[in-house]
């Protein structure tokens, strides 16, 4: 059986005694499920970031520029980065991936969960949907090596009648995930 990207990332974090992990998109927003991401690495020292201040936010920053301006304070500072449902909201995800790669220690691992097929939603904008190959390419261009990628949450698109046959032949998934390593 294939290990999921999330399970792969959890294994990467479990071999470290007290990993430092950056949680991206930490601010709870109205209507969110508020999942406890810390359960994936309970022995870790978690640092949180978001583009807006909030009760769960340690660092207010934009992942496209965040850690480049702070005199290198966070360069190679994290053993892991956990980035759930954030990348689709970033105008330049390739810049954010490069920035996240700079934040990882050598040997550090990144987990991203974003959407392949999903309704439009804000906070504050909704820019992209991704395929598995797109995430792999973005990570590669940022200097990261893919350990595992995949889709989850099979779904259906209800197309107009003239496109009905297309939906039968094409797979759709709510989520696409990746675990990559520096």
Residue positions per predicted region:
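Class I SAM-dependent methyltransferase Rossmann-like catalytic core
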Residues: 1-16
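Conserved SAM-binding loop
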Residues: 19-121, 132-136, 178-180
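Core dinuclear metal-dependent hydrolase active-site scaffold
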Residues: 25, 156-159
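A generic structural micro-feature
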Residues: 40, 72-75, 127, 168-172
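Active-site rim elements
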Residues: 121-125, 166-167
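Residues that flank catalytic or metal-binding motifs in active/ligand-binding sites
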Residues: 124-126, 131, 172-176
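Short alpha-helix
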Residues: 127-143, 148-150
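Core SAM-dependent methyltransferase catalytic element
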Residues: 159-182
């Amino acid at each position: 059986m294939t290990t999921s990207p999330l399970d792969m990332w959890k294994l990467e974090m479990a071999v470290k005694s007290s990993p430092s992990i950056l949680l991206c998109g930490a601010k709870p927003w109205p209507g969110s499920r508020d999942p406890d991401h810390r359960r994936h690495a309970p022995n870790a020292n978690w640092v949180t970031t978001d583009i807006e201040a909030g009760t769960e936010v340690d660092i207010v920053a934009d992942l496209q520029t965040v850690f480049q301006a702070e005199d290198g304070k966070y360069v190679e500072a994290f053993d892991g980065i956990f980035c759930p449902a954030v990348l689709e909201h970033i105008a330049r995800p390739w810049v954010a991936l490069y920035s996240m790669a700079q934040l990882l220690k050598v040997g550090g691992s990144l987990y991203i969960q974003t959407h392949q097929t999903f309704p439009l939603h804000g906070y504050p904008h909704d820019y992209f949907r991704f395929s598995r190959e797109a995430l792999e390419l973005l990570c590669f261009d940022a200097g990261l090596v893919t350990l595992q990628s995949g889709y989850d949450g099979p779904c259906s698109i209800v197309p107009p009648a003239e496109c009905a046959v297309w939906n039968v032949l094409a797979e759709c998934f709510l989520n696409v995930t990746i675990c990559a390593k520096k």
